[in-house]
Amino acid sequence: MDLRHLLFTLALVCANDSLSASDDLLQWPQISKCRSPELETFSCYWTDGKVTTSGTIQLLYMKRSDEDWKECPDYITAGENSCYFNTSYTSIWIPYCVKLANKDEVFDEKCFSVDEIVLPDPPVHLNWTLLNTSQTGIHGDIQVRWDPPPTADVQKGWITLEYELQYKEVNETKWKELEPRLSTVVPLYSLKMGRDYEIRVRSRQRTSEKFGEFSEILYVSFTQAGIEFVHCAEEIEFPWFLVVVFGVCGLAVTAILILLSKQPRLKMLIFPPVPVPKIKGIDPDLLKKGKLDEVNSILASHDNYKTQLYNDDLWVEFIELDIDDSDEKNRVSDTDRLLSDDHLKSHSCLGAKDDDSGRASCYEPDIPETDFSASDTCDAISDIDQFKKVTEKEEDLLCLHRKDDVEALQSLANTDTQQPHTSTQSESRESWPPFADSTDSANPSVQTQLSNQNSLTNTDFYAQVSDITPAGSVVLSPGQKSKVGRAQCESCTEQNFTMDNAYFCEADVKKCIAVISQEEDEPRVQEQSCNEDTYFTTESLTTTGINLGASMAETPSMEMPVPDYTSIHIVHSPQGLVLNATALPVPEKEFNMSCGYVSTDQLNKIMP
């Protein structure tokens, strides 16, 4: 509360000080104005204030070119408390300074130039004239005239004046102004008939911003002019406001209707739908419900979505077709007899027909009755079982061996069976080379037989397609011969055993007897001799005889030729084939058995 009282007291003190200062100013005499009506003479006016002895106040003036203050030349012409300067005391381009003073002090002082204080007198002789009325008789146009101030020498061009006209209805308080103009004739348009107007005019120097005093008011009344006016209702004004309001409402309603009618389309344009995954031929509901089995069955029924059937094994390759090679078409190879008409009739592994090209194709869906499942499913069958199945059905499934080769091998097996005694004698003559570090030259037919025994484990199961016959058969190039089997056979015959030791391991004797049984038809030139002091145990006599008989019995069955080709699994591309993968046989593990020892005498008795 104390703070509020303090602030209020300070405000009152400040207000009193300002009022006292203004009162002090009003108490002193001041120059109110100086004006020149025509730019030839000028007058200055002042106020006395509270000074009673007016006779003591004087107006002093001085031109800047002079240095002395002079008293006013005329105190009477311009009126009370004024000083008039006629043309003899007026210099337009020379500044003046005036001041109010008495004998002891100066009350007020001003400096100016004559052209700065020009305030023309008001125009005179205002008048108006009716120009025309509207067809309805509601509005009328008039023209207002006046004369320049008589004190201003406008005709000679000593001063140029601009005029401002203001008008209003009689009952109104605000004046309407027109733009200043140089002409003394101004038209007024669209004045309402039956209304009275007031008009006034004032002027100013063209280069000045201060207007002079207004002229006398001119009253305009259409009834006084003798114009017959039909009293009617108020002028019907065009309802612009209502038009704007209703127009905006109509546009809003139209926009709402358009939005409602085009709502789905606009919704798609503003918020486009998220595309759902679509597969041709598959119902999207299956994907939503998670029925993957049905989706997989549908995909499997279409060729476009069918998965590739080649295996992931590294030894399954793609074979390119070289159809345009004319040299391969004219070349006669061993596979021409292999894929002859008789052979194709008996074996139908390559007899499927391709509807697109007319050539033979082993595409899997077209051969439902073949036994490829026994050799193609490498993932479901072990390597050993698959090898057994291939060896049992290799002639029916692979279809790649010549009949004459089989007959030749069978005749060779029969010859071996009918002449055991001869084989025994040859073995007795050739049983010592493994112990004498000597090499023999093998018979080509027997070497081929031995190589065929091991060719299944070292055969490349791929073949180059050389031609497709008009009948639809696929002609394959000759496969690579088994080199590893031949090397093993030669290494077996070339094994050397030293005679430094008087004992021989029973396992070594069995190996030698097995080798001799396989090479019973090979001629031997070198002769062997053994030490008389050597001997071997008799516990292996029965085993050796049994092994010898078993090896002789198994030799014809193992002499079956192994094919160097394989069947076509699927046509992968217009120039590529996928062959069936044939599992390589897994070699049986050899276990070191404890063996007895035999002497050289017992060995001579066993060896024929």
Curated annotation (Swiss-Prot):
Record keywords, A-Z: Cell membrane, Disulfide bond, Dwarfism, Endocytosis, Glycoprotein, Membrane, Phosphoprotein, Receptor, Secreted, Signal, Transmembrane, Transmembrane helix
Biased composition (Polar residues): 413-426, 438-451
Gene it is expressed from: GHR
GO molecular function, one term: cytokine binding
UniProt record, GO biological process: cytokine-mediated signaling pathway; endocytosis; growth hormone receptor signaling pathway; positive regulation of cell population proliferation; positive regulation of receptor signaling pathway via JAK-STAT
Name of the protein in its database record: Growth hormone receptor
Chief location bin: membrane
Tissue specificity as recorded in UniProt: Broad specificity.
